[in-house]
């Protein structure tokens, strides 16, 4: 599954 904003790792996944 693609990484969503605010997934498991803070900061990471900020690909809006």
Curated annotation (Swiss-Prot):
Domain of life from the UniProt record: Eukaryota
This protein's record includes keyword Acyltransferase: no
Swiss-Prot/TrEMBL catalytic activity: a hydroperoxide + [thioredoxin]-dithiol = an alcohol + [thioredoxin]-disulfide + H2O
Assigned EC number: 1.11.1.24
Secreted listed as a keyword: no
Entry keyword set: Antioxidant, Cytoplasm, Mitochondrion, Oxidoreductase, Peroxidase, Peroxisome, Redox-active center
Predominant location category: mitochondrion
Annotated Gene Ontology cellular component terms: mitochondrion; peroxisomal matrix
GO molecular function terms listed in the Swiss-Prot or TrEMBL record: thioredoxin-dependent peroxiredoxin activity
Compartment annotation: Mitochondrion; Cytoplasm; Peroxisome matrix
Functional description taken from the UniProt entry: Thiol-specific peroxidase that catalyzes the reduction of hydrogen peroxide and organic hydroperoxides to water and alcohols, respectively. Plays a role in cell protection against oxidative stress by detoxifying peroxides and as sensor of hydrogen peroxide-mediated signaling events.
Subunit comment: Monomer.
Family: Belongs to the peroxiredoxin family. Prx5 subfamily.
Record's miscellaneous remark: On the 2D-gel the determined pI of this protein is: 5.8, its MW is: 16.9 kDa.
Protein name: Peroxiredoxin-5
Organism: Vulpes vulpes (Red fox)
Gene, per the UniProt record: PRDX5
């Amino acid at each position: 599954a693609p990484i969503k904003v605010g997934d498991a790792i803070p900061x990471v996944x900020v690909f809006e």
